[in-house]
Amino acid sequence: IRHIEEKDQQQLAHVIRSVFEEYGAPLVNTVYDDPRTEHIFDAMAGKNAGYLVVADDGGVQGGCGYYPTEGLPDGYAELVKFYLSPLVRGQGNGSVLFSQAIEGARRAGYSHLYIESFPQFSDAVAMYERHGFRHIPQRLGDSGHTATTIFMVKEL
């Protein structure tokens, strides 16, 4: 597990889109069709943000980060682009990425983390719940991913 590098962007975008296809999640108005998905390293630069990746001999196999999404309340960051290839699931990588992203947001001075998700990612939503994220009735901020239907927040 390491910080994202510019060279990781295309491979990471492929992993993210393949997870949407694998789970049958919506492909429109989501991370899937967002052109920024191919520029995660670029998006993080110069922001109070962070992104970690899981990498092996085959390259980048997933990642997770936090980002000050436009329109969020003061002190909030969004947990962003938390996706893993099936090749690295079930080995504790997701838990480590998730915990490190939460801790990174806390160290960066954020008071809350916000998440948007889908019912198709029920295992991830259950993990968020176990880690103290609570459901809220409506979206916060303007990620542009208007197809999301699950909104959660955690005080840090």
Report the location of each language-model feature.
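Flexible, glycine- and charge-enriched loops at secondary-structure boundaries
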Residues: 30, 91, 145
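C-terminal "cap" of GNAT-fold acetyltransferases
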Residues: 111-114, 118-156
